[in-house]
């Protein structure tokens, strides 16, 4: 598949904002409009999108409406030949990721680490859903701190399948993984096989599929603010009494609107975690009234 590579350079930013944080935020915004992979260096952020889905006309508006003020961008683009994602990962994401020294996320070409009790092997495809991004690592930290043994788990917007795979490795009795992108469905299956997991129920679709799903003890959704707001009622309808809803994929300034939506649906915010302006929330259902 041929890609268009965009190079985004930040020409002005507030002193208190690091270049890495600005590029992370831009990566998240670009991912929402179809960009599939990203590389950061000291001079620019390179973002890749398939030629068939290039949306060049949307980029100026995205930069003008960027969620942080005071930033000025310039960018260029060029058509790339077929990309070797293994080579890209070896050049740009060559170090495995440790999550709280409890879990190692590595590509197949990384060595194992006997000092880490749990490892996940993720095939090199893109930077999101590998543990490198804050939202993924925040959600993983929640899962690693929970007792998932025997739980029925739903992963909405599964991406690479990393959270679904982790849940199964942590003892979940069943895991359902849903995504609207057929690439994600294939990659989740591939990554599950790399981790010797064969029983994740992987489905293509959106929250409308939940009408035919059973109840779940834990629902994970690492997507974006707008989809979470639109679909939270569907999540709530499938969340059993005493269950847990974990949400991420948004900024800390989005916490109030998401919390308000959850409270209307009978959910209570029980914990907040954040890193570099990204947030992850834990909700539990309100106790039934007697």
From Swiss-Prot:
Q: Where does S-adenosyl-L-methionine bind?
A: 136, 157, 179, 222
According to its UniProt record, which reaction does this protein catalyse? L-lysyl-[protein] + 3 S-adenosyl-L-methionine = N(6),N(6),N(6)-trimethyl-L-lysyl-[protein] + 3 S-adenosyl-L-homocysteine + 3 H(+)
Please give the CDD domains that the UniProt record associates with this protein: AdoMet_MTases
Query: What GO biological process terms are annotated to this protein in UniProt?
Result: methylation
> By its UniProt entry, which Gene3D superfamilies does this protein fall under?
Vaccinia Virus protein VP39
Under the heading Pfam families, the entry gives: PrmA (PF06325)
Q: Report which superkingdom the organism of origin falls in.
A: Bacteria
Q: What is its EC number?
A: 2.1.1.-
Q: What InterPro entries does the record tag this protein with?
A: Ribosomal_L11_MeTrfase_PrmA, Ribosomal_PrmA_MeTrfase, SAM-dependent_MTases_sf
Return the similarity comment: Belongs to the methyltransferase superfamily. PrmA family.
Q: What is this protein called?
A: Ribosomal protein L11 methyltransferase
